Amino acid sequence: MVKGKWKRKIYFTGGKVLSVLSRLIPKDPKRVCFFCKSGLDDNSEALFRYMMEQGYAGPYRIDCVVDDPAQYPQWKNSHVSMMTVRKSLWPLLRSRYLFCHGEMVAIMPTKKQVSVNYWHGTPLKKINGMMEKLGDYRYDFFTYITAAAPAFRKIFAEAFGCREEQ
């Protein structure tokens, strides 16, 4: 979550501009981008490792946005690119498939993109759209969001301003 009223305003305004730009850029059907800034862990690591074990790294180009790419030397000579947030704009705009885990990118996916927010748990507190102080912003920057169980769909729909079936 972006803290501070003005930082949030700049963040979401920039996201609107990038969302428009994204519609103009063709998507690569063989490109996958993981936005896991804090690192490959929990759900991001599980999905990433599954894709590696199943051989997706050959036919697909896989980009991982992490804080410290040097932590992942084992992927250096594979079909995986580890990169910082500063170098991630092009992969984010070109990828057909986007995966993130709560560290939202304020860019709306286009009709030619599939964006999955595999949220890391169930919120026990108010988050995003549930908090009045965060203002009237959209938080549904994904095509789908995962919930730990059907009982939590309503909570996610309220928090992210999305439909329960997303």
Give the positions of each predicted feature.
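Membrane-proximal basic amphipathic "stem/tether" segments
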Residues: 1-36
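Active-site and donor-binding regions of nucleotide-sugar-utilizing enzymes
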Residues: 31-166
